[in-house]
Design a protein with these regions (language model features):
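A short glycine-rich, Lys/Arg-flanked "PGG" loop and its adjoining helix->strand segment in the class I
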Residues: 123-138
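Short alpha-helix
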Residues: 175-198
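A short acidic, Gly/Pro-enriched loop at the edge of an enzyme's catalytic core
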Residues: 99-110
Length: 234
């Protein structure tokens, strides 16, 4: 099997599984803000796209959702299984391919947290989400903030290059595409979604006691963008 480039395999998967548990960026900033946009999920069937090590899946389950969680990495799915056991349906799936495991109008909502910028076939993914979501369904999606990317990389704000970013462990890199706000909103609206809410996640107050420097930085410079998108109630 060819390993999808948008997944975190082997040591990279283990690295992110450990990092996501308590990271200022994940645990204290993106995750609470993104899941807040999902709202009341009790009794709802939710698709967790790019579920990683299962942190968002576990929270959705604890809130009473029925969850189908997918990821392209066997390594991360192993961590997700350790976290949620058999409480969720876990599937290995490359998000650059159609969601052929799901019938039309299967899910009440979907969560796609910090995954979108890794996907190449984004128009296809959005079309597939429109297909598998029920009428009036929702998609909660978070991604890197275009301003944060511009501040970090410099140059043109409109650069849409693919980036191979080196991590603190210099032997590990992740690949993603820089996307402008114009590109993001354009893709979502062109796919037929309507924008319900948009937030620039701030860190939880508890982070100040854990890492004051990161708390101050994340309170002043947005790292992520999160949206709640709706399908039509056809």
């Amino acid at each position: 099997m060819t390993l999808p480039e948008n997944a975190y395999h082997d040591r990279l998967g283990d690295y992110f599984a450990q990092l996501a548990g308590a990271s200022p960026y994940n645990a204290h900033t993106d995750r609470p803000a993104t899941l807040a946009l999902a709202g009341d999920v009790a009794g709802r069937h939710v698709l967790d796209l790019g579920c990683g090590a299962g942190h968002y899946t576990a929270d959705l389950l604890d809130r009473g959702a029925r969850v189908t969680a997918v990821d392209g990495s066997a390594t991360l799915l192993r961590h997700a299984r350790d976290r949620v056991g058999d409480r969720a349906e876990l599937r290995r799936h490359d998000l650059d391919t159609p969601l052929d495991f799901a019938a039309d109008a299967t899910y009440d909502g979907a969560v796609c947290a910090l995954v979108y910028h890794h996907v190449t076939a984004r128009a296809q993914l959005l079309a597939e989400l429109r297909r598998v979501l029920r009428p009036g369904g929702w998609l909660v999606l978070s991604t890197t903030h275009p301003t944060a990317e511009w501040l970090h990389h410099g140059g043109s704000n409109f650069d849409d290059a693919w980036v191979d970013a080196r991590l603190p462990d210099p032997s590990l890199t992740i690949r993603y595409q820089r996307l402008t706000l114009e590109a993001l909103l354009g893709e979502w609206l062109a796919a037929g979604f309507t924008l319900d809410r948009l937030v620039e996640p701030r860190p939880l107050p508890q982070l100040r006691d854990v890492d004051e420097a990161r708390y101050e930085k994340l309170s002043q410079e947005p790292s992520f963008l999160a949206v709640r998108l709706l399908t039509s109630a056809r």
